[in-house]
Amino acid sequence: QAVADQLNAAMASGRCEGMSVLAQRFYDGFESRPNGAGATSEIAQASVAKQIGYWWATQVAPPVAANSKTYRAMTPVQITNEIINGLRARSGFTLGLYSSVGGHSVNPIAVTKDGDNFNIYVYDNNYPGEIRKVVVNSASQTWTYGAAALSSGAASSTWTGTGAGSMDLTSM
C-alpha cells in the first residue's frame, strides 16, 4: 500500500507520461481505442483513467527506468537521430523533456532539418488536435520547446535544455 500511495502522490503532479504512452500505444496498434473513438482526443477520460495511471507507473519499473537511463546519457542530437530511426522503422517512442521548470512527455511524429536545427514535431496531450515542435540546435546541443506546460491548463512557458540528461525516450 505504501508504494501505491507514493505513486498516487507523484502522479498528482501530472499524468503526461501515462497519456503519451497510451496515445503512442493506440497509434502503434498495441491498444484499441475504447468506444470506437477515431482520435485519442475523442476518448472520455473515465474510459482510460486506469490505463493512464498504469502506463504512468511503468516509468518507475526497473526495465523502463534502465531504458530511460540509457537514453538520458545521449545528447539532444543523438536523441533526435534515435527518433528519426524509430520513425523510419515505425518503432514508437515517447520523448521526455527535462528543464529547470520540470519534466514533460510528448509523442514525436516527424523530424525535419533546417540548417543547424532539427524540428521534432510532437503531439502534446496538453494541446489536443495541435502539432507542436521541439527545436534541437545541433551546434550547441540544446533544445527549445515553446508553450510547454506541466499539465493541461497550467501556465505555459518556453522550456530549454542543454546536453545529455535533458531529454530521453521511452521505447514502446
Cite the ranges covered by each PLM segment.
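Cysteine-nucleophile protease catalytic domains, especially the papain-like/related folds used
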Residues: Q1-V77
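Polar/charged alpha-helical tracts
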Residues: D5, A9, N81, N85, ...
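Residue-identity detector for glycine
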Residues: G14, G18, G29, G36-S41, ...
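Intrinsically disordered, low-complexity regions enriched in small/polar residues
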Residues: Q24, D28-G29, W56, A73, ...
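General "foldedness" signal
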Residues: F30, P108, V134-V136
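Residue-identity detector for threonine
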Residues: T40, T58, T70, T75, ...
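Active-site-adjacent substructure of cysteine-protease-like catalytic cores
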Residues: Y71-V122
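Cys-His-centered catalytic/binding microenvironment captured across papain-like cysteine peptidases
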Residues: S100-G103, T112-M172
